[in-house]
Amino acid sequence: YAMAAMFFLASCSKDNDETGGGNGGGGETGGVTDVTPVTSDLTVNLTTDKACYKPGETVSFTADALPAGAKIRYRTLNKVISEQAVAGSSWTWTAPATDFTGYLADVYRTKEDGTEVILGTIAVDVSSDWTRFPRYGFVATFDASKTESKIQEEMAFLNRCHINGVQFQDWHNKHHWPLGGTREHLDAVYKDIANRDIYTQSVKDYIRIQHSFGMKAMFYNLCFGALDDAAGDGVKEEWYIFKGTGHTDKDAHTLPDSWKSNIYLLDPGNAEWQAYIAQCNDDVYANLDFDGYQIDQLGNRGDRYDYKGNKVNLPKTYVSFIEAMKGKHPDKRLVMNAVSSYGASQIAGTGKVDFLYNEVWGDEADFTDLYTILKANHQYGNQALKTVFAAYMNYEKGSGEFNMPGILLTDAVMFALGGSHLELGGDHMLCSEYFPNTRLQMSDALKTAVVRYYDFMTAYQNLLRDGGEEEKVTLVCTDASKNLNLNTWPPQKSAITSFARRVNGKQVVHLLNFLSANSLSWRDLNGTMPEPRLVTKMPLKLNVAGKVSKVWVATPDAHAGASQELAFEQKDGAITFTLP
């Protein structure tokens, strides 16, 4: 793996220190010397039939080739739940009864000397509600090329990455009239905002096939958009917002001449507009089996006015809009974009959105900004709502392939901090706010790596994004000849940065490899982030409080995320161990 040693997760379970307070622990001694060696020969590709499962549901596994003597093992974190011999290319497992839990299934064999050889892995998310651990993807093209078999193939890839919710971008007819046709008569084909063909059957097939994989389907639309023909469809002049007080200059989002229309902006707090668009959404739900509404906005517009000349407080109107949408369709899910964090606290404060969604730009371009957003969202959402970043990678790279080191470093940081990344589409990865843009491709190596990273995020979700308290740790490399600079968050160039959290009596330490980083921005604008310098056999000393019972490590960059127990010694208030 080109990216090895970039993202480690080491956890020290303290059997007498559940709170993390400790008592100094200077006198604790001990350690573990007898651990099973682990290596890997990743020749077995595994799939499951769904992206997530309810407790007690049957999980169906398929493997492309299983060598004789292989076993399948199911673990949550580092604990083996069950194990079985496998024969044949498919088998089933009953998801355990505990809700909201991540598992890693691995196929392995044991060598004569006792070494375990990992042959392949796959994560399993047992969660009755997808919004507890959202892994968001997208679809954005619905033309004649999207046959049922093509859609099945695309969604199979998203399923392999455990994508449990899919945003439908640029699927609609008009922002103020999203359905192609009427409630009583759908158009077989209609044009989207860019005058692309949209096949209603393709939209329906995407939804149906996503549902077969256990995914949820969310339709995208602005909260306040209308096209230039909106008056003919019943949209009133009094509903718009204006750049001045004289209601003559409508606020607009300008688009290319070849597109249908510019988008003119309405007052999201106007009760008549809310009733109008809620009824349009009702027409959508009556015909298309969407699970909810991904609400969009356009960030800070500056001073804007309603028809009567009153200044409009947009974040306040978002609250009113969200409440109106939930009131009309209480059983449907809502998510709203906080563009550059605009309106984030108000959106979260409604208590009506299922997770938080931040589209991040140049004003939030650094890794430290991601941390700041997650911390703020944690407060805004009363510690209950997860965060998804819409973060467009390699934004200024004109063509070719995505830069794998940049993608994986950003994902590593987001996942370590407890977020997730909207980036995976059925047929391409996201490089632009215009979701149909396919100017950059994923290499086969990146596709493989992304599967490993999403397995990792899913299998270890209970350590990554399920509560806990952040803490600073003292971690040093005890071999000066390695010439390694270890620092605690925030990241530094030419360093390995640790980020630590205490979760359910375990100390979780992430090691993020910035040794070769040319920037501390997540954007990797031109796709120039270098591959990180690989570090192996790194002897480490970690200060700890309380007695440590086990040290284990996992990374998406080695053994396909399978965990490995490490030998360690504890004395003088610290443990020493070697990171493989």
Predicted feature descriptions by range:
Residues A4-D41:
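Bacterial Sec-dependent N-terminal signal peptides
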Residues Q297, N382-E471, L515:
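Aromatic/acidic polysaccharide-binding cleft in carbohydrate-active enzymes
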Residues L119-K174:
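An acidic-aromatic substrate-binding cleft motif
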Residues K482-A545:
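Carbohydrate-binding surface patches
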Residues S128-E148, F219-L288:
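Active-site-adjacent "subsite" loops/lids of carbohydrate-active enzymes
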Residues H172-V203, A231-P268, G299-K316:
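Aromatic- and acidic-residue-enriched carbohydrate-binding clefts of CAZyme catalytic domains
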Residues E569-P580:
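C-terminal beta-strand-rich structural cap/linker in extracellular carbohydrate-active enzymes
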Residues P268-L356, W361-K375, G381-A384:
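Active-site neighborhood of glycoside hydrolase catalytic domains
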